Amino acid sequence: MEVEEAFQAVGEMGIYQMYLCFLLAVLLQLYVATEAILIALVGATPSYHWDLAELLPNQSHGNQSAGEDQAFGDWLLTANGSEIHKHVHFSSSFTSIASEWFLIANRSYKVSAASSFFFSGVFVGVISFGQLSDRFGRKKVYLTGFALDILFAIANGFSPSYEFFAVTRFLVGMMNGGMSLVAFVLLNECVGTAYWALAGSIGGLFFAVGIAQYALLGYFIRSWRTLAILVNLQGTVVFLLSLFIPESPRWLYSQGRLSEAEEALYLIAKRNRKLKCTFSLTHPANRSCRETGSFLDLFRYRVLLGHTLILMFIWFVCSLVYYGLTLSAGDLGGSIYANLALSGLIEIPSYPLCIYLINQKWFGRKRTLSAFLCLGGLACLIVMFLPEKKDTGVFAVVNSHSLSLLGKLTISAAFNIVYIYTSELYPTVIRNVGLGTCSMFSRVGGIIAPFIPSLKYVQWSLPFIVFGATGLTSGLLSLLLPETLNSPLLETFSDLQVYSYRRLGEEALSLQALDPQQCVDKESSLGSESEEEEEFYDADEETQMIK
């Protein structure tokens, strides 16, 4: 039997898969979220003052906001460490890299730069780890990246200088982004396809909870070095537990390592208490073994090319709008810890809604993704029609702040869906490469996002126009993708040989290779059960849709 049939025998979501969900979608995501937003508290700037009389004895007191601030910034550039320690005093009850290395005034850009280094590392990690895990296996690459992630993260807490901190943040980003991506794929490949949406949504939900958890830890641990080190205790526990999980049976199957795939499946069956389960994996005669994918394969086949270009844009927009709305919301005032917790908790309602909608036949993955993207885009576009001053009446409720919160809720939902949707659109042999490439473009959106709020100086609603236009465009483009709800999971490129789909009323398009040498037989007559569903066919016989 094939691997999908084997999962029906061993259990698609048994006791052991529930444990894997708890490990890789709950505990791991709590840790991943902590590292991803570490700079929010570690890089926060405490309140401070300087000895104005000593620094600027001739400065007029009446020109404080303009002249004195500029003079103080100029002085920081030339003053040595001992002078800064003598004249600058932090009054807050917590420490950070800003207070330790005086990253204030003209030096404050270094805090943002450290955050950029982290996401630059994630940019590198998501694409490189995807290819490595497709070639060497999910578990090996996941564990290696996880161990290095913890090592570099602990090194953050012992940083002797800003430069060392920035370098280790880049390395943490590379390992954190890469290993979490591989863990997501590993988890999905250990459960039945019907439960992919649930597993993915749980991960997104607990990433949001992880933000609130980090705020709580920061409230009690006010030393940035202690905080940066202690948050890795949770990661260490997850790493030790991960040593005993199996390799992905789907990856082993796609590589032709049938005996090892059977061992992994029998382990799952044993932990699911299905001791009498027996099966033997076989490959169809037409399927080549040890098939591997590369980055170029995403653009070699016409179907994969179309999917990849649309998905890259959607991932880019999700990241751009998510981080852009967060930055343009402004300072809420009050406790930094309460604000950070709220920024995570506000995302939580979107996840149960996602789990419900994407599993409904009348909505599915495609329509739900499109609806959330379009709703978020429209919410942002409405801002351009609102008055800039809105203190009374209906505008006290319907304003840029409330609409941006709605936008963040919807984009959080879309981000969760696109993760699940993307993993279902690519075959196993290239799934990590596809996810890594799309995730890479989301990091580009995250890098650009901080610059969008500054457009308010041109026109106050211009940032929302950018977010709304890109969100609405990506929502419409998502309708060009096929539905994957209850569809058989693609394993290898041969599963794409006679793969067809309908696109906006056009006739079905069979797979074609851009390279003439890669062209496959296109003479099979294809059909579709409905205009709303897509079918996957094996090269020799039709594989029925899973209802």
Swiss-Prot record:
It is a multi-pass membrane protein. InterPro entries: MFS_dom, MFS_sugar_transport-like, MFS_trans_sf. It catalyses: (R)-carnitine(in) = (R)-carnitine(out); O-acetyl-(R)-carnitine(in) = O-acetyl-(R)-carnitine(out); glycine betaine(in) = glycine betaine(out); N,N-dimethylglycine(in) = N,N-dimethylglycine(out). N-glycosylated. Residues 522-547 are annotated as: Disordered. Inhibited by gamma-aminobutyric acid and drugs including quinidine and levofloxacin. The chain crosses the membrane at residues 22-42, 111-131, 141-161, 165-187, 201-221, 226-246, 303-323, 338-358, 368-388, 401-420, 433-453, 462-482. Residues 529-547 have a biased composition (Acidic residues). One of its GO terms (biological process) is monoatomic ion transport. It is found in: Cell membrane. Signal peptide: none annotated. One of its GO terms (cellular component) is plasma membrane. Expressed at highest levels in kidney and brain. Expressed at high levels in skeletal muscle, heart, liver, placenta and white blood cells. Expressed at moderate levels in lung and spleen. Expressed at low levels in thymus, small intestine and colon. Expressed in several intestinal tumor cell lines. Glycans are attached at residues 58, 63, 80, 106. GO terms for molecular function: amino-acid betaine transmembrane transporter activity. Keywords: Amino-acid transport, Cell membrane, Glycoprotein, Ion transport, Membrane, Transmembrane, Transmembrane helix, Transport. Organic zwitterion/cation transporter with apparent specificity for amino acids and their derivatives. Has low affinity for its substrates and may regulate their flux across the plasma membrane at high substrate concentrations. Bidirectionally transports carnitine and acetylcarnitine, possibly regulating their cytosolic abundance and further fatty acid catabolism via beta oxidation. Displays high transport activity toward zwitterionic substrates such as glycine betaine and diet-derived ergothioneine and carnosine. Belongs to the major facilitator (TC 2.A.1) superfamily. Organic cation transporter (TC 2.A.1.19) family. This is Solute carrier family 22 member 15. The lineage of its organism: Eukaryota, Metazoa, Chordata, Craniata, Vertebrata. The gene is SLC22A15.
